[in-house]
Amino acid sequence: MFGQFVEKRESMQTNNKMAVAPVGKLIWQMSIPPLISMFLQYSYNLIDSAFVARLSENALTAVSLSFPITTLMNAASIWIGVGVNVLIAGYLGERKQDEANITVTHGLLLAFGIGALLNLLSLLIMKPYFGAFTNNEEIYQLSMAYMSVCSFMQIPNMAHIAIQKMIQATGNMVAPMCFQIAGVVVNFVFDPLLIFGIGVFPAMGIRGAAVATVAGYLLSMILAFALLLGKKQKVRIKIKGFHLQKWLIGRIFTLGLPSFIMNALSSFMVTFVNFFLVAYSDTAIAFFGAYFKVQQLIVMTVNGLIQGCLPIMRFNYGAGNRDRLHSAFRYGTALVSGMMILGTLTVILFPAQLLGLFTASESMRSFGISAMRIMAVSYLFCGWSTMISTYLQATEQVFPSMLIQLLRQFLLLISFMWGLEKLLKITGIWLSFPVTETATFVLALLIFRAGRKTETLCSGTKTQ
């Protein structure tokens, strides 16, 4: 019933729409739902943090220390999801329905297998990980309590994101947004009930926030499967005659790798920033955790728009339509630039209000307001670099796409942070973000221009 309720009804077949609909209108249709979905996806941790901060600053620090682990889990989910999305969109562009269905089955198997593995790994690394970042026994115990429950979110998280990307590849962008909304609503409603023990619910503290998160992901997975198994889906699970194809698994990993790197590097980056900040105070770690959730909400919401452009570019690359490929890139870049300017202005003008969401102490506000304004400047260049990386990904230029993300979120950032922190102390840490994004944009533009000179379209040749 859920599948019938949210099924997008169109008079035009999706493949025809991707090939002939006006590019500007098509990007809006394809991008708004994943934009909202990414906003909702990254609101989970922000919602948890906002409620948990009302327990204590130590509780906020605990959730902040857990953020790199949960971000790495989300990155793995997006890795499989985007790899499957790119392949399915390409196959549909080439009118290879059977290959698209086989890709669906492989994607689901990978989601469950890798999800179970990450569940186990997160449970194994918790103690040494949290022990490395705090000597405060209360923060350590709160971190363990939160992450011991959140570890079990990975299978439902990977499964529902994989299905979300499969359905988006067919042009149906509304249905995935619906089951995403359902999960966030559950998390938002049950967070205060389980954290503070409202009504008949027990007061579980920080553990209650984790239970609400897992419940939200579980509901999203159930609704996603109900949709995928509906009769009117353009891709289906192929069981008859199915056998694992190693080359296809490798293709999924390869095509989704740039998106994984973009998301996973943020996890490693937060870990390294925490190593710098631990020399200053637990409050500095709590602040950066709060700020980074705001940043991720802005950046990853824009990334949702970018991911809406990806299947359009990929489809027309598969169909050999150079003009529509480039038109989608130009229009998408203009939209991303506008949204990043809006995000920059929001953080620069309202830093105190944003910190207020996390019940910030006077100590945190004393340096946090100026730090947020400094780091917000980086948004102006971040969107352009990410859009260039996505274009390279859509046209199967995987290594240059990955290189841009490596430079932006790790190699250049850590290098600038190390040097500027030596010169300017904690202010140098904040300044390293806009400096890195500016340098990455210049390098990404050079990589993009070099790639355009050698770019070739597949013109209907097979995608494998």
Summary of predicted features, one role per range:
Residues 20, 24-43, 47, 69-76, ...:
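Residue-level signal for short hydrophobic patches within transmembrane helices
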Residues 29-48, 149, 160, 183, ...:
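Transmembrane helical elements of multi-pass membrane transporters/channels
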Residues 72-75, 187-191, 221-225, 297-300, ...:
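Hydrophobic transmembrane alpha-helices of multi-pass small-molecule transporters
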Residues 39, 43-61, 130-137, 193-204, ...:
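Helix-terminus/linker motif at the lipid-water interface of multi-pass membrane proteins
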Residues 1-31, 88-155, 201-256, 313-378, ...:
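Short alpha-helical transmembrane segments in multi-pass integral membrane proteins
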Residues 60-120, 157-176, 274, 287-345, ...:
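Small-residue-rich hydrophobic transmembrane alpha-helices
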Residues 81, 150-168, 176-184, 209-224, ...:
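Short runs within selected transmembrane alpha-helices of multi-pass transporters and secretion channels
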Residues 122, 165, 191, 195, ...:
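Structural signal for membrane-spanning alpha-helices in multi-pass inner-membrane proteins
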